[in-house]
Amino acid sequence: MLRYIIPRKKGTFVIAAFLTVAFFCIVAYHRNDRRRTKFQFPDIEKYAEELVRLPETWNGELHQIPNYTAPREGPGEKGKPVVLTGKDAELGQADMKKWFMNVHASDKISLDRDVPDPRIQACKDIKYDYAALPKTSVIIIFTDEAWTPLLRTVHSVINRSPPELLQEVILLDDNSKRQELQEPLDEHIKRFGGKVRLIRKHVRHGLIRAKLAGAREAVGDIIVFLDSHCEANHGWLEPIVQRISDERTAIVCPMIDSISDNTLAYHGDWSLSTGGFSWALHFTWEGLSEEEQKRRTKPTDYIRSPTMAGGLLAANREYFFEVGGYDEEMDIWGGENLEISFRAWMCGGSIEFIPCSHVGHIFRAGHPYNMTGRNNNKDVHGTNSKRLAEVWMDDYKRLYYMHREDLRTKDVGDLTARHELRKRLNCKPFKWFLDNIAKGKFIMDEDVVAYGALHTVVSGTRMCTDTLQRDEKMSQLLGVFHCQGKGSSPQLMSLSKEGNLRRENTCASEENGNIRMKTCSKKAQFNERWAYENKMIRNLKSGKCMSTANLKPGDNAIVVECDEKDEHQKWNFIDPAKA
């Protein structure tokens, strides 16, 4: 790709020079070895794709923070999308496959671009006493990240952070191999006059241990972790520092705005969310609870959140290590965000979102680098999550094993140090966390009418209700399938005391003879309420009963007129492990 080797402002001259040199090299090569077969002139685009990007050499001038009040023109300015056409579009789509983001579009955007400010006026009106606030180390971990997304992260932090509050930016290179991230990166950061420190690890640590390494190197009173494909927005740092200065045990997060992985469009708004979790131990976004809405007296107040997404957070550096940092035996990435969330709340701290602080993040559909852990472990999220379940979830770890029965007996390393940490910090039980912080979290096997694999047996053939691997984040029809046993999570169902036939987050309703699973209402609607009588599952609104009549595995479940003599309508909730 010529974009990697040709500076934009010198395009015509450099192309001519490149082709001239290539021509004479080919002639010399051909003349010096007549024994070779006839030489084929290489395809210039294909050849260029093999070359590494050579960023422009630093000219010795120190970085100047842009005047964002002045008009700016150029691709992507003000967060506008970069829409590619023709050959550019082809290169961009190739990047989507390689990088899971459009690096070609990113390369057209200034490293110092302006982005829309989503803050409300009340946030902008807050005055901060910089002299009274602690200084911050911003830590950015990267491994073989694309050049412009990485550098735009750094530039945005430098450009939009008060110098009085920014102690340093630590770039921690987790064993990158790409040439442009070697000497060219060393050269690029010189323009920041020592404000940016580059620390290199020559053995892969993985994100979790690399964050710990960065935190140990930091000298600021506050540490902020950012992913390597972010853009800090206007006024992002001040409210974070102020909150941690006010409350030492608060671990806080900015509001995370979305940057398109394809067009690099910046989408920021004032919608407020909190973090939740699934019993499979994945992070989820949730709306603000009624209790939290009432607690907050003004729109600039911090938001208490049960969990955090993980990539972007800030903490008092001393407190971060006092409360246990990260579990150093967790591998690469995954699970550490819920582990620190549960631990912070249970051990006397808090997790909070700061509505006046915004940072954009490129959400990618995959990882362009190796995510395999030690001993060739390709399930690092699973094994990391088991470590947190065993240490922090008490008996509620059973709910994790409902989803990951395969990990129940798996060795995930020594947990002694983490158990001792919990004891030393005098942390509360996980039930306290559920009762006081994650209120309303549905527990499928606790305080319900019935729970288990919902199955029926007809002529010796057993079938269970099943999600059929459909995306439960969207409204989907419930299906039936052969009972899988061993706690197969897609087949687990509960009947709540409110009459909801439900899974963790979705409830069943009768719809045109089928059963639709959709996000549960706060108060069950009449068509979402069911009764379990005489082994029959009856919808209270339609009066019809769930049936497998004339169904085969993989079909959608149906409701029909109730008939107590029809064995297709007889259902049992049975122990998931025996289903």
Curated annotation (Swiss-Prot):
Membrane topology label: Single-pass type II membrane protein
Positions on the Lumenal side per record topology: 31-579
Residue ranges of the TM segments: 13-30
Cystine pairs: C123-C356, C347-C427, C464-C483, C507-C520, C545-C562
Keyword Hydrolase in record: no
Annotated region described as Catalytic subdomain B, given as residue ranges: 302-364
Entry's Gene Ontology BP terms: protein O-linked glycosylation
Glycosylation sites: N67, N370
Cofactor(s) the protein requires to work: Mn(2+)
Subcellular location, record wording: Golgi apparatus membrane
Stored SUPFAM superfamilies: Nucleotide-diphospho-sugar transferases, Ricin B-like lectins
UniProt GO MF annotations: carbohydrate binding; metal ion binding; polypeptide N-acetylgalactosaminyltransferase activity
Highest taxon, organism lineage: Eukaryota
GO cellular component, as recorded: Golgi apparatus; Golgi membrane
Pathway recorded for this protein: Protein modification; protein glycosylation
Cytoplasmic side: 1-12
Residues the entry annotates as binding Mn(2+): D227, H229, H361
Annotated substrate binding sites: D174, R204, S228, W333, R364, H367, Y369
Keyword line: Disulfide bond, Glycoprotein, Glycosyltransferase, Golgi apparatus, Lectin, Manganese, Membrane, Metal-binding, Signal-anchor, Transferase, Transmembrane, Transmembrane helix
Positions of region (Catalytic subdomain A): 133-243
UniProt xrefs under Gene3D superfamilies: 2.80.10.50, Spore Coat Polysaccharide Biosynthesis Protein SpsA, Chain A
The keyword 4Fe-4S belongs to this UniProt entry's keyword annotation: no
Note on domains (UniProt): There are two conserved domains in the glycosyltransferase region: the N-terminal domain (domain A, also called GT1 motif), which is probably involved in manganese coordination and substrate binding and the C-terminal domain (domain B, also called Gal/GalNAc-T motif), which is probably involved in catalytic reaction and UDP-Gal binding. The ricin B-type lectin domain binds to GalNAc and contributes to the glycopeptide specificity.
Similarity annotation: Belongs to the glycosyltransferase 2 family. GalNAc-T subfamily.
Task of the protein: Probable glycopeptide transferase involved in O-linked oligosaccharide biosynthesis. Glycopeptide transferases catalyze the transfer of an N-acetyl-D-galactosamine residue to an already glycosylated peptide. In contrast to other members of the family, it does not act as a peptide transferase that transfers GalNAc onto serine or threonine residue on peptides that have been tested. Some peptide transferase activity is however not excluded, considering that its appropriate peptide substrate may remain unidentified.
Name of the featured protein: Probable N-acetylgalactosaminyltransferase 9
Natural source organism: Caenorhabditis elegans
Lineage of source species: Eukaryota, Metazoa, Ecdysozoa, Nematoda, Chromadorea
